[in-house]
Regions:
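Protein kinase catalytic-loop region centered on the HRD/HxD motif
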Residues: 7-19
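Catalytic-loop of the protein kinase fold
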Residues: 16-31
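Conserved activation segment of eukaryotic-like protein kinases, specifically the C-terminal portion
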Residues: 55-68
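Conserved end of the kinase activation segment
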Residues: 69-79
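C-terminal lobe of the eukaryotic/viral protein kinase catalytic domain
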Residues: 97-125
């Protein structure tokens, strides 16, 4: 199932123009009778017109949101879906989401101050 979700997001992100789902969470993953996972609910999806552009609106569900969405004026790209997908994987492994005590909470202030989400993902400062 995890691979199905990743392939679904890859499909969205590699389309021309690419699509950012923006609300990837467990309740938006449907399972077929054969056990295949399918991404659903594209109500918040955004079509990106440029590979270099950043989206600037706050959307999604808090427990699955990437840290860059917590900024007062968020700028983000397809990587927010990757982060949300990781939260779905966490939920699949743990059978629940953590009680708002995310390991990256310590980074929250740094991200809001610096708006440097690229170094958050790459580890480069």
């Amino acid at each position: 199932m995890a691979l199905d979700i990743a392939r679904g997001l890859e499909y969205l992100h590699t389309r021309k123009p690419s699509i950012i789902h923006r609300d990837c969470k467990s309740s938006n993953i449907l399972i077929t009778a054969k056990g295949t996972a399918k991404i659903a609910d594209f109500g918040l999806a955004k079509v990106k017109q440029s590979t270099r552009s950043m989206v600037r609106s706050l959307v999604g569900t808090v427990n699955w949101q990437a840290p860059e969405l917590w900024h007062a004026h968020p700028k983000y790209n397809h990587k927010v879906d990757v982060f949300s997908c990781a939260m779905v994987y966490w939920e699949m492994l743990q059978w629940h989401l953590p009680n708002k005590k995310f390991p990256w909470e310590v980074c929250n202030g740094w991200l809001i101050e610096s708006s440097d989400t690229e170094s958050f993902y790459t580890g480069n400062e």
